[in-house]
Design a protein with these regions (language model features):
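Helix-to-loop junctions at the C-terminal end of transmembrane segments
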Residues: 98-111, 201, 308-323, 408
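Cytoplasmic helix-loop-helix junction between adjacent transmembrane helices
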Residues: 145-188
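A late C-terminal transmembrane helix in Major Facilitator Superfamily
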Residues: 376, 380-411
Length: 453
């Protein structure tokens, strides 16, 4: 196997680089060969190596098993649904805190070093949670272990996106294809992961489901860490470079958040849409006497999203990020209103149809938000930026599920279906606040991005 360097970005005075996504707004730049959609996707294994796609997909699978696995484990072993819900929320809080921390460390010292520490810690945290829940440990111990499980969950999806940004400099269509693939992989994972938990818990036990997730994390998380595409830490900009660009852009959390605030808010709204929709669907199915089928009904949204995320690369270059964001978020709003009407009608068929339509607009918005996030962040902070977006989604899901549950219990199922429409409107507003063309930013030369052929 040989490693191939990516084209280097032109120099910029602040001592950083904005990566491939930043190249979308630069001119002039090398023209990317025009390829068909399938040919563009065919570039991905050539750039990263054939093993990268399955390794990265399986490595992210345990992440999608944590929330439902923790809920099921704690609820079953303690007999308390309330404690199970708290433990699940604690894992989400841990993820929201640990995700950006992992990303920032990966930016500084490289992904491999971070993952080689985080993966074993996550396995130990899962084992500790299983032990605590199974032996009747105090609630505080169980919740503490759940926080650690979330905090040490490897941020495979965001870190994989960082690798694609490095490998696709000056290749905007290939970058879009990579982001589309990543969103599809996420969607499939978030459908498959909970299904695996349910199957393993039914056949064996909730403990077996969580330990299976830990085993997959150990094997494929380490394989992801050791893969040649792992990005090294970026060299620290000189004092003069930081002064020229503003140290906040490279050093502080607040400085980076200021740069990527719009996509972070967009991802928060997207998470709220997911969480509130899931809760509303669960309430709908509970009213129908088939609560155990709520996951299958909600999965309809994920399948539609996975398909359209892959299709984003076929959109013309003239259909820019801001236009895509606003257009597809508007489609989300319309279809969320249809879901609201379907939820109020009591018709399962109508609800499934509305969710299928809703999912068609989710994928393109997700791809666009991650692409914009990469565009707005310096490459020296791309890991932190991507994990910020993922963490915002986790927080949004928890917020949407919490508020949705209260509305469903206090007002009714039909009212709960109004919350996804509100979240979709927030997505439109955040998209409108995005500048139509990012300010011109020069970029500096990056070290050769890893690639495997």
């Amino acid at each position: 196997m040989t490693r191939t360097p990516s084209p280097l970005a032109p120099a910029r005075p602040d001592g950083t680089a904005d990566g491939a996504a930043g190249a979308l707004a630069q001119a002039p730049e090398p023209a990317e060969p025009r390829r068909g959609t399938l040919a563009t996707y065919g570039e991905l294994p050539r750039l990263a190596g054939k093993a990268f796609l399955p390794i990265a997909f399986l490595a992210r699978l345990p992440f999608s098993m944590i929330t439902i696995g923790t809920l099921l484990l704690v609820t079953t072993t303690t007999g308390s649904l309330a404690l199970g819900g708290l433990a699940s929320a604690a894992a989400a809080v841990g993820t929201a805190l640990g995700g950006p921390t992992q990303g920032s460390l990966a930016d500084r010292i490289g992904q491999r070093k971070v993952l080689l520490v985080v993966v074993p810690l996550n396995v130990l945290a899962v084992v500790a949670l299983v032990q605590a829940a199974s032996t009747g440990a105090a609630s505080g111990v169980i919740l503490g272990a759940a926080v650690l499980v979330g905090a040490f969950a490897p941020q495979v999806g965001p870190l994989a996106r960082v690798r694609w940004i490095a490998m696709t400099q000056h290749r905007p269509r290939t970058l879009l294809a990579a982001m589309g693939y990543e969103s599809t992989a996420d969607e499939i994972g978030f459908v498959l992961g909970p299904a695996l938990v349910g199957i393993l818990a039914s056949v064996w036990s909730p403990q077996a489901a969580m330990l299976f997730a830990a085993a997959v994390c150990a094997v494929f998380g380490l394989a992801f860490a050791l893969h040649p595409t792992a990005t090294p830490g970026a060299p620290k900009p000189s004092a003069a470079a930081q002064a020229a660009a503003g140290a906040d852009a490279h050093g502080s959390f607040v400085g980076l958040l200021r740069r990527v605030l719009v996509p972070v808010l967009g991802m928060l709204a997207m998470g709220m849409l997911f969480g509130s929709t899931q809760t509303a669907v669960t309430s709908f199915m509970r009213d129908a006497g088939a609560e155990e089928q709520a996951g299958l009904v909600y999965a309809v949204l994920g399948f539609g999203s996975a398909i359209t995320a892959l299709a984003v690369v076929a959109l013309p270059a003239s259909f820019g990020a801001r236009s895509r964001w606003v257009s597809f978020a508007s489609g989300l709003t319309v279809t969320a209103v249809l879901a609201f009407l379907a939820g109020g009608s009591g018709s399962l068929g109508a609800l499934i149809g509305a969710l299928a339509l809703l999912g068609l607009f989710v994928g393109p918005v997700m791809v666009t938000i991650f692409t914009v996030g990469g565009d707005l962040s310096p490459s020296s902070r791309s890991g932190a930026a991507m994990t910020m977006l993922a963490s915002a989604n986790v927080v949004g899901v928890a917020l949407g599920a919490s508020v949705g549950g209260q509305v469903a219990e206090g007002v009714g199922t039909a009212a709960a279906f109004a919350l996804p429409a509100v979240a979709a409107v927030l997505l439109v507003v955040t998209g409108l606040s995005l500048r139509s063309r990012p300010a011109h930013v020069d970029t500096t030369a990056l070290p050769p991005a890893p690639g495997v052929v």
